[in-house]
């Protein structure tokens, strides 16, 4: 990893805190952004963990505006500057995506992170053209987001390599669980300052950094950002033993909300854990729902014992 790269470090795919009525919880957004800044991690708003496909356009813009304002009013104590705001972009109407991306950029988002449209199965050529269209059209820098688990498509490595040379495409967040693919994608970004690799497979955060990755995107960072901040620093500063130890510890914490649950259920459970720290309530956006009171109580007790 080249620390000269503009985009690097820990980017937490932030939950979207909402009220019982399903409206954005602005106060909770502010609390979480300050919590992240204190631990020198940045947020990815409206990604998979943030229920991105369920956030309305109006709330999405309010989310970005609130996060940007909080980040600038509460800079990271470590750097003295505002943390970077990454804004997720999902959807199937490209013209609407371009408008929304520009609204986020105008509101102060630093990077737009876009998944593939998911209604139709796309050919590699169509995937490449989609990202070229976005990159050519939007006002802010673009990061590719590959997530097979939800899009049911995988952006081929050769497509990523070609897109990596587009002047407005600054990196890749890859959540696909494939070690060979990880190595191949890191090889694309290695020794380049214009394109960064972020690992979205949280359980392999340390491994990706050891291979030369630039950043990590762990959902468990919503609960323990300080552990991932330390993991990153240990990995890039020549302390692999400590990085591996932290990887093992955070993997165990992740089991509290992930084990035996669907992806959607795990996001509810993660909010329950965050509630124990006074960060947000465990309300969800439709179609996701809360867990039973008994299950929430069990999760909360485990979270308090961490």
Listing of model-derived features with the role each one plays in the protein:
Residues 2-12, 16-152, 289:
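Active-site beta->alpha loop and helix N-cap motifs at the rims of alpha/beta catalytic domains
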